[in-house]
């Protein structure tokens, strides 16, 4: 989601109407907010998230590490899922800098009770490395097919 869509009242009305029509929709819905969008209007995003989380919706911060989020915002926003940007994942099996950064982000996700997703997983070697450090979900083009592999907690 973009900051613009969060601030668009018509979209929010449609979402609330859908939630009212299906009591189980909220618990099945995950909305992704890019790191940069969250920072454009943090107060609006924070209020929207709090309101929707009360209705059972989960939120993922997408492309984390690609923008300007301070760690303070991770605490304030209360995202449910942290999606680690692909720039830290590509080549991770041999890039020690990316390994250290990914492990740090995974530790932060664990501390705040967030589900950790590795984006842009493209090789079996990267998948094995990420599994060995405890990532919760792999997302990317493994074996040439885009897919997400939830690993369970």
What are these language model-derived features?
Residues 14-18:
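A short, hydrophobic coiled-coil helix within the histidine kinase transmitter core
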Residues 1-9, 28-42, 55-153:
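EAL-family c-di-GMP phosphodiesterase catalytic domain
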Residues 48:
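Conserved functional hotspot residues or short segments at active or partner-binding sites
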Residues 21-26, 52-55:
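Short helix-capping segments at alpha-helix termini
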């Amino acid at each position: 989601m973009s900051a613009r869509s969060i601030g668009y009242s018509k979209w929010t009305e449609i979402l609330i109407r859908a939630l009212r029509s299906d009591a189980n929709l909220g618990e099945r819905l995950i909305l992704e907010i890019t790191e940069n969008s969250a920072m454009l209007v943090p107060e609006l995003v924070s209020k929207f998230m709090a309101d929707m989380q009360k209705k059972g919706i989960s939120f993922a911060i997408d492309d984390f590490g690609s923008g300007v989020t301070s760690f303070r915002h991770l605490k304030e926003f209360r995202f449910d899922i942290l999606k680690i940007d692909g720039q830290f994942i590509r080549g991770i099996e041999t890039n020690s800098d990316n390994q250290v950064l990914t492990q740090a982000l995974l530790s932060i996700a664990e501390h705040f009770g967030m589900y950790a997703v590795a984006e842009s997983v493209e090789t079996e070697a990267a998948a094995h490395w990420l599994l060995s450090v405890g990532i919760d979900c792999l997302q990317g083009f493994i074996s040439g097919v885009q897919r997400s592999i939830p690993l369970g907690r």
